């Protein structure tokens, strides 16, 4: 039971500590959102190509 107050105090100290990034941010860092947007855009283009090319080959020429 003696350890419980010490444990609670340690938890409070850890929770109130300022969060620090593991490495400093540089100008070359790109937000994760842009990677997700690029992935969604690429998947959308590929799915449009598959659907369109299945029915009409001439459509594939415009989706490049």
Curated annotation (Swiss-Prot):
<keyword id="KW-0800">Toxin</keyword>
<comment type="similarity">
    <text>Belongs to the conotoxin T superfamily.</text>
</comment>
<keyword id="KW-0165">Cleavage on pair of basic residues</keyword>
<dbReference type="Pfam" id="PF16981">
    <property type="entry name" value="Chi-conotoxin"/>
</dbReference>
<keyword id="KW-1015">Disulfide bond</keyword>
<dbReference type="InterPro" id="IPR031565">
    <property type="entry name" value="T-conotoxin"/>
</dbReference>
<feature type="propeptide">
    <location>
        <begin position="23"/>
        <end position="48"/>
    </location>
</feature>
<keyword id="KW-0964">Secreted</keyword>
<feature type="signal peptide">
    <location>
        <begin position="1"/>
        <end position="22"/>
    </location>
</feature>
<dbReference type="GO" id="GO:0005576">
    <property type="term" value="C:extracellular region"/>
</dbReference>
<keyword id="KW-0732">Signal</keyword>
<dbReference type="GO" id="GO:0090729">
    <property type="term" value="F:toxin activity"/>
</dbReference>
<protein>
    <recommendedName>
        <fullName>Conotoxin Pn-B01122</fullName>
    </recommendedName>
</protein>
